Amino acid sequence: MQAEVRRKRYRQETRSEILGAAREIFVRDGFEGFAMRTLARSVGCSLGAIYVYFTSKEELFDVLVEESFVHLFEALGILLKERGKDPVRQLKRGLRLYVEWGLKYPSEYQIAFVVRNPAKKPYRTHRAFDAARALVKLCLGRSKAAEGELELRTQALWAATHGITSLLTQRPSFPWVSKQRVIDQVIDSAVQGAIGPAKRQKSKGET
């Protein structure tokens, strides 16, 4: 029994080591520049040993992408457990958590949103995006101005938030006035643009 436990732990540790090394190589060399032999040298094992755990670089990449999104969703999970009275404030908090996660885990962020597999596959949105959409819908409420625009406004918010996250991770030496102030300005402006007009709409009978 103990021998089996040790073998299982060893397999888990080896798999994690392979994934960690693969993540850095994908970020450094891109999907097309990634080579399983390079990965084997990085881990310090034979090429055959890599294939015991993963059949191809495509499988490796898919696992890394899924792990990154799961990690991001966990970081945003606290918002899903809270039902605050101010959905706009909650939305801004979620967007800030997104940026903070990207800055704290830049390699995972690159895998999730920057490095691409050129093979054409149907794009599948993750639960993290679904959670953002739900918050935007809550902010918009029953505004007629927002009818049919939920997806547009959610995507616009993500585009702005992704933009500042990518810039901060890829241009850390740029003379930013203040990274936190820039983040706050981008998020506040994006939310005002996406939610503000809808919030100003008045229902019938309202003065």
Could you tell me what each predicted segment is?
Residues 17, 21, 25-59, 63:
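Helix-turn-helix
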Residues 68, 72, 76, 102, ...:
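Hydrophobic recognition helices of helix-based DNA-binding modules
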Residues 110, 114, 121-122, 126-129, ...:
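Hydrophobic/aromatic-rich alpha-helical bundle segments in the mid-to-C-terminal region
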